[in-house]
Amino acid sequence: MILLIDNYDSFTFNLAHYIEETGMPVKVLRNDKTSIKEIKSIIKPSKIIISPGPCTPNEAGICIDVIKEFYNKLPILGVCLGHQSIGQAFGGIIVQAKKIMHGKISSMTNENNSEIFKGLPKKFDATRYHSLVIDPKSLPSCFKIISNTKDNDKDVIMGIEHNDYPVFGVQFHPESIGTSKVHGQKIISNFVSL
């Protein structure tokens, strides 16, 4: 079963639906309605997805604690706020984006042969809803960049993968209607298949 941590985002159940389409059961819990103890002893997930949300990682309930507790035990995927939370949990700094992107489609790169991008083209369009990003200068060395986009001719991190553990983050929204359903579902399916 996959645990989907809901950061009070309207797209959370789009993610849940994509997970269900793979045949994997999903349990959705709000970021302030569970505990590490409950996750370990009662829920016992095989993987964890951390949803988008309207706040910062500091305001995302249990998310950073979950990442710190489970990163070396279970595969984790963070989407948007979840991606930022992964960066921050490992020491990255979350900063205001130079360009705010709410409901905008951008071209993403597919770099470094990430398992979650397996079967995707080298460039694909995806939807962005964010005003925060991981500062590239602060990206912990334990991560590699698996996706970028360009804003004002500057690279913006759109995807990261831990070098030693199956921990992934995507800043864009694979579950948004503005992202090709084929590509969005493929990312979720690839993660579920790990």
Q: Language-model segments: which ranges?
A:
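A short, Lys/Arg-enriched amphipathic alpha-helix followed by its capping loop at the start of a domain
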Residues: 18-24
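Short glycine-rich anion-binding loops that position phosphate/pyrophosphate groups of nucleotides
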Residues: 52-56, 82-84, 175
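Gly/Ala-rich beta-loop-alpha elbow adjacent to hydrolase catalytic centers
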Residues: 63, 78, 82, 87
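The conserved beta1-alpha1 loop
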Residues: 5-6, 51
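Short, Asp-centered acidic motifs that coordinate Mg2+ and/or phosphate
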Residues: 46-47
